[in-house]
Amino acid sequence: MRYLTAGESHGPQLTTIIEGVPAGLYITEEDINFELARRQKGHGRGRRMQIETDRAKITSGVRHARTLGSPIALVVENKDWTHWTKIMGAAPITEEEESEMKRQISRPRPGHADLNGAIKYNHRDMRNVLERSSARETTVRVAAGAVAKKILAELGIKVAGHVLQIGSVKAEKTDYTSIEDLKRVTEESPVRCYDEEAGRQMMAAIDEAKANGDSIGGIVEVIVEGMPVGVGSYVHYDRKLDSKLAAAVLSINAFKGVEFGIGFEAAGKNGSEVHDEIVWDEEKGYTRATNRLGGLEGGMTTGMPIVVRGVMKPIPTLYKPLKSVDIETKEPFTASIERSDSCAVPAASVVAEAAVAWEIANAVVEQFGLDQIDRIKENVENMKKLSREF
């Protein structure tokens, strides 16, 4: 499976075309809109979320709530477009109109794509860069992830994302009993954190950063349960599932690091403290006594829960902007200010969940069948049976 997205932050709409979804999958616009609404929540979001109420429209690839096997097209309208029709319109304008155009940007923001993208594409108005590099694009990535989650749900595979850290505040309580328990608590949390006390401290940290004109980052975790053994490959580097998951997480705006299981803690431990002992269970077959490697060994799933974390840097748009240089005058100035969040970590956990779900669904569909969801279900069950009886 694959998908492409198109659209600018303040353009008329965002679009994604999803190819390779098996036929027969039940999905509705409401399934997708549920995930889009989750992305828009979270303490620390900016005024844009008060304007937009994202709703996806399926324009092809689905008939009577069942996928056809042909490409699925989804569009999400930008309600703020009415204020940007002149500035972001596709119609030609005169040089005089261009010179008088408001909101042209010549002062790049440190930490953003502005300057590098402007040099790459020779844009004198860096709005041409920031409109596409904006995290607004993650709206349709979450829409694609919603389709992937429907595939996984058919196969008994569950996915959940949550927040472990915002700023210096870390969640201490993570003793959830199941993915359902984790979701039940985090869906009610303004910062998507299982630890309620840590969640209150996280909100205070976000408020403090906002009051100071600053931004704040954090760490999110995604857990996948119900995976069959052997998804992925050890044969080639580009078929290892952990490499694909790492790329997916790092492709999210502002994410700068990724780890699995105990992750970077492994550097300070002996091998006996890192690797998971193999045990036999009459019901489950081969399993592990621990899950320090996060459900992945040799680029393949072990059947244990996949545990992947990503670190998100603070958003680079600051209301107390850093120093920069005007590309027209070459004089020092403070960077441009765009409407932005002070913290997007809670929303980013939903985006990370979607990104991980997509890669998992893609790997499962590729390995167990491409065309029909019922055939894939049968093949997955056969693989689980083989694993138990091996």
Swiss-Prot record:
Residues involved in NADP(+) binding: 39, 45
Entry keyword annotation includes DNA damage: no
Name the Enzyme Commission number(s) assigned to this protein.
Answer: 4.2.3.5
What does the subunit comment say? Homotetramer.
> What is the protein's given name?
Chorismate synthase
User: What is the organism field in this record?
Assistant: Bacillus velezensis (strain DSM 23117 / BGSC 10A6 / LMG 26770 / FZB42)
UniProt keywords, alphabetically: Amino-acid biosynthesis, Aromatic amino acid biosynthesis, FAD, Flavoprotein, FMN, Lyase, NADP
* Cofactor: how bound: Reduced FMN (FMNH(2)).
> Which taxonomic lineage is given here?
Bacteria, Bacillati, Bacillota, Bacilli, Bacillales
Tell me the residue numbers annotated for binding FMN: 132-134, 253-254, 298, 313-317, 339
Q: Name one GO molecular function term.
A: chorismate synthase activity
Query: What class does this enzyme belong to in the EC scheme?
Result: lyase
